[in-house]
């Protein structure tokens, strides 16, 4: 994509709120736009433009995504999703549980592990010039690092389906120490990594195996307090081990964490934890989804009087700052996907209100019901298929509406991401990141 076209897209004042559904490439426009808005160069030290890389997306039959597809020259950080540790993973699918069992056969509990070793180390994605004893994504990342010295590459531990062992580990300081030690040893072995990212969903509960709505999984106040202290101990311990590694390698290492919004963020003692962290990635998406009938924007920048429960990225970000996260370390999240519903009631395509509901989440999507990758929306949900493109300027949020099928899809596009980047700059945030890069492979 030519830079002149990018510049034109950034500065364009054309009306994008019409029902004519015209997508531009998010990764080609918006992340570059974010880099242009937030910082004069893609790899400036002061601002983050990051993307999560999902290690399983190379298997996508429609749009396989590999390291070679990453726009490395436009990013400051690549975050590899996901690694884990030996421990309970009851929420993970059977194939993942099998992988973890294999990797942990000869390891102590809470040892840091590569879950999908085939993808990371064995699949042949092509020749590399770097001298490494492995293939897979890791070889490609080692080459990418050699070609882009200023970029930061971090492995992320946890994720929605693999956060259960964090809760078990939190009960034992020795387990925390062991995980930290082995995680740091892992990045020392695969030395293209520049630190560690944590995606514990969530300290204090609210994740897949700690739902507050289920009396069998809801954490007690005592357990929440323990995990609050454990998270601080965890980041303090990892920071200490990374600093020790720095003395050996003469390199600086980053430590970051993903942050849930609302009550989930409030469960962490940020005044105690944030000094040990380089960046905190605010998951300002999935405000709503097909798991409920409430319908509306899922990743809107601004809360409005029409927002369900007053939700908006700006509200959540400001809450995090009030809770002790330094604004310059806080990175706002953007989604390369959408969430959808069907049977939307009493709606004709106007701006969604805070009482909008549907019969259920969409019973179709990209690989899972109600979830739509951006490339899928771009290719299969246009005006040709009866979808009208709408834009809520007050919320800075696009959405699709199919009046015949009564389908509502909330998503992110270049306009809304540009708005987030501009707001992040105005608010002196640390930057912007996306989950996840393969959503727009163009």
Model regions: which residues?
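Gram-negative bacterial Sec-dependent N-terminal signal peptides
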Residues: 1-43
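Glycan-recognition patch characteristic of GH18 chitinases/ENGases
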Residues: 45-187, 213-214
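Short, well-ordered coil/turn segments that N-cap beta-strands
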Residues: 47, 75-76, 149-153, 192-194, ...
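A cross-domain feature marking catalytic cores of carbohydrate-active enzymes
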Residues: 53-55, 82, 155-159, 200-202, ...
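Extracellular low-complexity, Gly/Ser/Thr-rich intrinsically disordered linkers
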Residues: 58, 377-442
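Substrate-binding surface in catalytic domains of secreted glycosidases
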Residues: 60, 90, 94-122, 204-372
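Conserved, mostly hydrophobic/aromatic
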Residues: 78, 155, 198, 238, ...
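An active-site-proximal structural segment forming one wall of the substrate-binding cleft
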Residues: 171-197, 234-241, 265-276
């Amino acid at each position: 994509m030519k830079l002149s076209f990018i510049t034109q897209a950034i500065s364009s004042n054309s009306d994008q709120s019409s029902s004519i559904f015209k997508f531009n490439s998010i990764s080609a426009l918006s992340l570059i736009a974010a880099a242009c808005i937030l910082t004069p160069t893609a790899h400036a030290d002061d601002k983050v433009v990051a993307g999560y890389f999902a290690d399983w997306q190379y298997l996508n039959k429609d749009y396989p995504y590999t390291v070679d597809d990453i726009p490395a020259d436009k990013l400051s950080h690549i975050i590899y999703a996901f690694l884990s540790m030996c421990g309970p993973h009851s929420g993970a699918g059977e194939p993942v549980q099998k992988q973890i069992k294999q990797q942990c056969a000869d390891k102590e509990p809470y040892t840091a592990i590569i879950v999908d070793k085939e993808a990371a180390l064995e699949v042949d994605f092509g020749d590399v010039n770097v001298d490494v004893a492995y293939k897979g994504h890791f070889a490609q990342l080692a080459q990418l690092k050699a070609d882009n010295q200023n970029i930061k590459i971090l492995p992320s531990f946890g994720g929605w389906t693999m956060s259960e062992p964090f809760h078990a580990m939190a009960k034992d300081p020795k387990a925390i120490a062991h995980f930290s030690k082995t995680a740091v040893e892992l990045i020392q072995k695969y030395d293209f990594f520049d630190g560690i990212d944590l995606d514990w969903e969530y300290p204090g509960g609210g994740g897949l195996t700690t739902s507050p709505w289920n009396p069998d999984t809801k954490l007690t106040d005592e357990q929440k307090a323990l995990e609050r202290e454990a998270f601080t101990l965890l980041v303090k311990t990892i920071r200490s081990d990374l600093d020790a590694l720095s003395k050996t390698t003469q390199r600086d290492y980053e430590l970051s964490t993903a942050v849930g919004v609302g009550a989930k963020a409030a469960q962490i003692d940020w005044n105690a934890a944030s000094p040990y962290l380089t960046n905190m990635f605010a998951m300002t998406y999935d405000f709503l989804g097909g798991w409920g009938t409430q319908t509306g924007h899922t990743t809107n920048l601004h809360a409005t009087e029409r927002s369900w429960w007053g939700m908006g990225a700006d509200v959540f970000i400001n809450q995090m700052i009030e809770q002790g996260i330094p604004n310059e370390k806080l990175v706002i999240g953007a989604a390369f996907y959408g969430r959808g519903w069907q049977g939307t009631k009493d709606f004709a395509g106007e701006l969604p209100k805070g009482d909008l509901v549907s019969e259920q989440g969409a019973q179709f999507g990209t690989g899972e019901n109600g979830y739509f990758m951006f490339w899928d929306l771009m290719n299969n949900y246009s005006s040709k298929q009866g979808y009208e493109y709408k834009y809520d300027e007050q919320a800075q949020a696009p959405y699709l509406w199919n009046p015949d099928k009564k389908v509502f899809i909330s998503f992110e596009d270049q306009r809304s991401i540009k708005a987030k980047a501009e707001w992040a700059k105005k608010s002196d945030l640390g930057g912007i990141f996306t989950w996840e890069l393969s959503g727009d492979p163009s």
